[in-house]
C-alpha cells in the first residue's frame, strides 16, 4: 500500500482500499474523517508527494477476515512546494473482501519522539 503511494500508483492504492469505503484520521490533528471512497483523481489532487518509509510493522490477525496493523512511518513530504520531515504512528484495519485483503480503517497520529514520552530501555523489552 505504502509502496504504491510512494510510486504514485493510485490505481494500485485504490485497489488496496475497501470498495465500500474507508474511515481515516489524519496526523494533522483534525477530526476523524467520514467514510470515504477514494478515486484516482482525488489521490492525484491531494497526495502530498515525497517518500514515506515504513518501520517496525506488526500485523495481528483478529479474526479470519480482519487484521490489525500498526507501524511507524517516516519520510519527507512535499506540500505547496515546501518539503518537510514526516513522522507518524499508523494503525490500520485490513479486511478480506471478495477473498482479497484491503484497507478499511487508517489512523495516523504524529510521532514527535520525545515530546511527550522519553524513550526508555523498558520500551524495547518484551
What is the predicted role of each segment?
Residues 16-32, 42-49:
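A short gly/proline-enriched turn/hairpin at secondary-structure junctions
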Residues 6, 75-79, 94:
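Beta-strand elements of well-folded, non-transmembrane domains
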Residues 17, 27-28, 71-75, 90-92, ...:
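A mature extracytoplasmic/lumenal domain signature
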Amino acid at each position: 500500500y505504502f509502496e504504491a503511494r510512494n510510486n504514485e500508483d493510485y490505481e494500485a492504492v485504490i485497489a488496496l482500499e475497501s470498495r465500500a469505503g474507508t474511515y481515516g484520521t489524519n496526523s494533522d490533528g483534525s477530526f476523524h474523517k467520514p467514510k470515504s471512497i477514494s478515486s484516482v483523481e482525488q489521490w492525484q489532487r491531494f497526495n502530498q508527494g515525497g517518500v514515506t518509509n515504513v518501520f517496525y510493522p506488526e500485523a495481528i490477525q483478529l479474526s479470519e477476515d480482519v487484521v490489525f496493523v500498526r507501524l511507524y512511518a517516516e519520510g519527507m513530504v512535499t506540500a505547496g512546494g515546501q518539503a518537510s520531515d514526516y513522522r507518524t504512528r499508523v494503525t490500520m484495519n485490513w479486511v478480506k473482501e471478495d477473498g482479497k485483503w484491503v484497507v478499511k480503517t487508517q489512523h495516523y497520529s504524529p510521532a514527535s519522539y520525545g515530546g511527550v514520552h522519553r524513550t526508555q530501555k523498558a520500551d524495547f523489552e518484551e
